[in-house]
């Protein structure tokens, strides 16, 4: 996704951003959807969505409930203190409150946390004004602070009874300002990390194959050995036979990245194709008018678009009895 309001549905409900308008604010947001929370609820899990921002921002509170969360906790529930004057509660304060709230939850539980301090205007608490390097862009200091805040969360969390029985998933909702040409391309503007961590259970490994936010839901549910059917537009990243791709939509153009190619499609015709592993800046369009070399990617993208449009229009974004 390229916006927070698109990233949240992709991460928690495996809903790609394939419309001009974000799903949360679209006419279809009242339809039934499934999510990590809704599926886990059917398996005995309590769920809560924590948002360091002001209640109502981007409709996250309403979306959390429509996605099946039992509770939503925003700045209103946190209280008026520790406000950054713009978005919400400073990360290091909200992290601690988040962890303490989990201490009172009956296991098993599933929580989601959306933090705010690494967002423009990149405010850092006064007490940390000279602690972190400032760099050439204001975001760099705020990223250093956000990293520190995450560190303090894990320092506290590792002492809690739920820590060793928890799968942590860390990712971004979207990219920030770029500093190099690589991250200004139609591939680079989507490049974010996804980290899966479970103390003592997952061995350290770096995987540079294609993944997307929509893969998080099927990966988490697969890891937990959930067998019931659900609707998702991604794949289980822990399954070596899973097909890897990343689909997106921007400025009237659909895009799909596979392990071999990045293709762009206007809904009728293939527009461009790049061998992105060898052409990181996407300088050489290898599409010469013949779709044949790219049929695997093109057919996958068409299938995703068809399924998404059909399910959105017909309220079929969840498995119903």
Language-model segments: which ranges?
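Solvent-exposed soluble domains appended to multi-pass membrane proteins
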Residues: 1-321
